Design a protein with these regions (language model features):
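Bacterial N-terminal signal peptides that target proteins for export
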Residues: 1-7
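Functionally constrained cores in energy, signaling, and assembly domains
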Residues: 4, 18, 164
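Acidic/proline-rich low-complexity IDRs
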Residues: 8-11, 94
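Hydrophobic h-region of N-terminal signal peptides that target proteins for export
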Residues: 11-19
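Acidic, serine/threonine-rich low-complexity disordered tracts
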Residues: 21-86, 92-180
Length: 180
């Protein structure tokens, strides 16, 4: 009987350990490349009553600057525009109902999964591959059909995070890193 209990505890420990590897950490590091400069923002995404709150912070001149973006329930469900609003210290901004920040809306994510394409910012994106993985999630690699901008989107229906943006015509590129 003792042997069965010990074996059960070991198996439970392995299962919990494996599940922990699949989870994203609470805080993600966004590394932005903008006009030759690099900026690193720590960001957390917190669901709140069908909405989503993104808290950000950055260490500048030995002082933490911070703020937030709130995505309305309508934006989380049906947003069609990715906001590129620059963070400003102390500002807590609720984005318009058609805008999201660093995530796709549920409608766009469902379209990407079902049709291998979606529209955002009045631009069509098509799925190229899903070869890369992070935290045991696939990254859905898409490219816009007009100017060649690319995104890698976390294949996670709970948080379809834009993990990386490259070749952005606005020259606002980023990649998420997981702090170890």
């Amino acid at each position: 009987m003792k042997q069965k209990i010990v074996m059960s505890l070991l198996l439970l420990g392995f299962a919990i350990g494996g599940a922990a590897q699949n989870a994203l950490p609470d805080t993600l590091l966004f590394v932005f490349k903008l006009h030759g400069q690099t900026r690193k923002y720590e960001m957390t995404f917190t669901p709140k009553n069908d909405a989503l709150v993104l808290n950000w912070r950055i260490l500048r001149n030995l002082k933490w600057q911070k703020g937030s973006y709130a995505l309305t329930p309508q934006a989380v469900e049906k947003g069609t525009v990715l906001s590129f609003l620059m963070p400003e210290d102390g500002r807590h901004i609720t984005l318009p109902e058609h805008e999201t920040a660093y995530v796709l809306s549920q409608q766009a994510y469902r379209s990407l999964k079902a049709r291998q394409r979606f529209d955002y910012n009045h631009t069509e994106y098509i799925l190229l591959d899903s070869d890369e993985r992070v935290a045991d999630f696939a990254l859905l690699h898409v490219r816009d059909t007009l100017e060649g901008g690319e995104m890698w989107i976390l294949d996670n229906p709970a948080l379809p995070l834009v993990w990386s943006m490259q070749n952005n015509p606005l020259e606002i590129n980023w990649r998420v890193e997981i702090n170890k």
